Amino acid sequence: MYCEKLILLLGCFWISSSASDPADPLLVDLPNGKLRGRDNGNYYSYESLPYAEPPVGDLRFEAPQPYKQQWTDTFDATQPPVLCMQWDQFIQGDDKLAGNEDCLTVSVYRPKNSSRNSFPVVAQIHGVAFMFGGASQNGHENFMREGNLILVKISYRLGPLGFVSTGDADLSGNFGLKDQRLALLWIKQNIASFGGEPENILVIGHSAGGGSVHLQVLREDFSKVAKAAISFSGNALDPWVVQQGGRGRAFELGRIVGCGQASDSVTLKKCLKSKPASEIVSAVRNFLVFAYVPFTPFGPVVESPEAPEAFISQHPIDIIKSGKFAQVPWAVTYTTEDGGYNAALLLEKQASSGRELIVDLNDRWFDWAPYLLFYRDSMTTIKDMDDYSRKLRQEYLGDRRFSVESYWDLQRLFTDVLFKNSTEISLDLHRKHGKSPVYAFVYDNPANTGIGQGLAKRTDINFGTVHGDDYFLIFENIVREPQLRSDEEIISRNFLKMLNDFVLSENGTLAFGTCDFQDNVGSSKLQLLSITRNGCENLELESFP
């Protein structure tokens, strides 16, 4: 907390005394010294700017500390950001280790050819399960083409380095969320030096990034760093976001890397700090039950109230019900087949048998379902888990077997349990207990190729509108073809205009194309905007009792 107050106090001086050189816009003055960016034609980039001290040595498993080094030479801001160290499931081969432990940076992208002297700001928190990915995983050429917004991408600690927790004050966890928070403070205090408007900051994220954004909003002081927020296909109530069972995983991690003698959190933390980061991160493979399931063995937790600088010390449901969260305009979204992100891997044909993994669910459903659907640690007995697994299977598949032919029913189950239901519950709770506008949209417009085809490694299946089909119209991604259809081009431009208008709105209104979003606060029903290739329309759903 002291660090945040110090930054906010110093920020007033920084904003008034720091600015880019009008004669050389690539040269920017910061409190740490001068930096030089890159000219990319229609925008300038200033990449890999440190916002925190390297989280190594004694600073590993600690809250991030503001970066305070002074540059004697001009800082080279032309190098792309490194990945935070991770065990990347999408790397081929046995060694999936990537990235560096010293990785806490932001990258700033500023329009070049524009009549504006200053720009509103979009801060992006990247996704991918709190385990891998990075600030450079999504492109930004499409985003920058309109020339209306500054984009800032945030890197933060991932996996066990970012989220291991013993559930007490000694190894509290949520270090990745605390990184994000410090990065947002850095943006608030320094973005004016790049021509940004610190009073007009919109924070967005997709998937784990969306869940992160919502968790940031659930801090009352979020309004000090941002004006509004959007969570795409991820929010704090999704069952894969806030985890239980962290203490057991923390000590299991210790056992794997040679800290098995530790019987308390202090000893475990000290031992883990002495181990190579590569060993800690590589241990992730030991937590996978099959393929890369569970997707998120290490993620956000509810911290002990005694933890120093706790990020959250209550469950998000309780925070929302208390009304003690940031009263800023917030939007949340999902796609009609969001669950394809978790289900599509089951359609990959196995090299050993030539059959799809989904067939094995017929014999392994009770073993695998709790990990696939993230209720393994939320139920106390095997009987409870088996009863719930049986109920889910009966509700969505009846007596039919798991197969390629029944895949869509399984995908619908995954969408409902992991995304749709929790999004609507979150929307309803904000409607009842919030004061600022709350919006939602559901996206239904399948990409020609998307994350479903990428995970299943096949193109003969129609996956529908899966995870990312909307977000990747804003930020291009390698999993989908770069050339947009004519309908996607229109939607893409409407999304970009939506972001621009939302951050500039004085009363928190939100619109997409010709459709105005309906505010859920004060409404007797849930209000969602449906976006398809044919346009948009408002939907009303019954609220929860």
UniProtKB/Swiss-Prot annotation:
Alphabetized SUPFAM superfamilies for the sequence? alpha/beta-Hydrolases
Where in the cell is the protein located?
Secreted
Q: Which residues form the active site?
A: 207 (acyl-ester intermediate), 467 (charge relay system)
What EC number(s) has UniProt assigned to this enzyme? 3.1.1.1
Pfam annotation, one family: COesterase
Q: Which residues are glycosylated?
A: 113, 421, 507
Report what the protein is called: Esterase-5B
Source organism of the structure = Drosophila miranda
Q: What is the lineage of its organism?
A: Eukaryota, Metazoa, Ecdysozoa, Arthropoda, Hexapoda
Q: Which gene encodes it?
A: Est-5B
